[in-house]
């Protein structure tokens, strides 16, 4: 069902206000890089993930952690842990998989066993950076929409008792794929003039939740 004009306007405004830090890290020269927009972040990380060198893949995965934890104090610790714990074999397997990945792929990525990449939040970030026009992130911020009085796709996620992250299983992979499809549908049918991809729609919903406008976000997700 197409979004109303009011819903489209609210979503486009949220997309424009999305303000997550556009940063990566240059691990060779040991300095942070600030990009003009998320397009720069996407281009750099995708290039690293699809590099023919395992050190490039390692840097791409480390940069997903660096970007994803940009507003959290233990970011550098998580990045360091990953770099110390990831094995050459895991990087070889990841390089082979990421270059040929089809579909949602989050179960396949999880099976590689990369440290720091066990839950759906960060594994979906890997998938998103490979193809941001078609794949998006599903993280804890979006799970908060389950608290709204409107049923959304996120109500279909399954959690183990006392889970602190979104587990990856076949059922949740199916929910993730439906979420990606929903974002693609909004981008192609409702927001054609904005030249947006699926990830821009997801970032708009994320921004709405972060800006205490979760009810409107839930209405959009339930309508589309």
Feature map (PLM): residue ranges:
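Amphipathic alpha-helical segments within well-ordered protein domains
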Residues: 46-50, 80-83, 110, 127, ...
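Catalytic DNA-binding helix-loop module of base-excision-repair DNA glycosylases/AP lyases
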Residues: 107-147
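Helix-hairpin-helix/helix-loop-helix acidic hairpins
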Residues: 53-118
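A generic structural signal for ordered alpha-helices
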Residues: 42-43, 87-88, 120-121, 161
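C-terminal accessory module of base-excision DNA glycosylases/AP lyases that mediates lesion recognition
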Residues: 1-43, 47, 57-62, 135-224
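Short, charged/polar micro-motifs that form catalytic or ligand-binding hotspots
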Residues: 50-54, 112-113, 128-133, 169, ...
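Short alpha-helix boundary/capping elements
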Residues: 68-73, 131-134, 209-213
